Amino acid sequence: MRRQGEKSMKPLISIIIPCFNTAEYLPQCMESLEKQTIGFDKLQFIFVDDASTDDNKTWNCIVQFEHIHPNEVIAVHLDENRAQGGAKNIGISYAEAEYIGFVDSDDWIEPDMYQKLYECVVKYQCDAVDCCIIKNFPNGSEEIFTKKGDIYDYFEKSITEGGTHWIKDFMHVGYGGYLVTGIYKKTIINQNNILFPEHLKYEDNYWSAILSVYLKDFYHLQDNCYHYRQRENSTVYLRNVSYHLDQMEIEELKIKTYQELGIFERFEKEIEADFLH
């Protein structure tokens, strides 16, 4: 592993970027990070190369970016592939800010994304906030994706207080697994040891579901700030038998964790509905 530079001030947000053979897309991702209106120097960027197999192209791209921004960027290289869940866990261990965010290395974000998200957590003093995505297709077209539903309309207007109804609302609406659109309070993650499953796909679905159990308040911003690249060889598109098996294992792991936390029986109906969704 590799680390350079020390910030004189604690960053506002630590952003974790797992990378695997994405040298082709990293420049656009990095450029969008550099343009953040909240201030590049107010952010911490943790790039985790998950043992890429592209003759160091991805790693060299990350190291070059670290050399340009030694005080804001941390480059971490894994000798063994741990899949996105493992890479994200490593990234969290390096995070110094009060809030944590994630960006996929083949995506990019709007210049004001983190400014808008951070302004929300400051204004509403909430544990987490997220926004909406824009799906970008290879032919240049895009699709504006906005979360709908009564509970999200409510998020847009005010804070949802934590408690039993929060879990029921989560199960009813579903978070969608778009973890990359938000920022999350690090103390909640660390104090409750909320880790991503490793060597499994759909790790975001597990992590966001377990995180929701501990959130006292949450804000949803309807602004579309995250560009979600649609490419045929990405993790989401390569859905074969092993991917479906991973998805089933993730759902079983969620139920097991709910049982360990003592909430399964209380919300069994909602949890089973989510499992069958």
Give, region by region, the residue ranges found by the protein language model.
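Donor-binding/catalytic cores of nucleotide-activated saccharide
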Residues: 108-219, 229-242
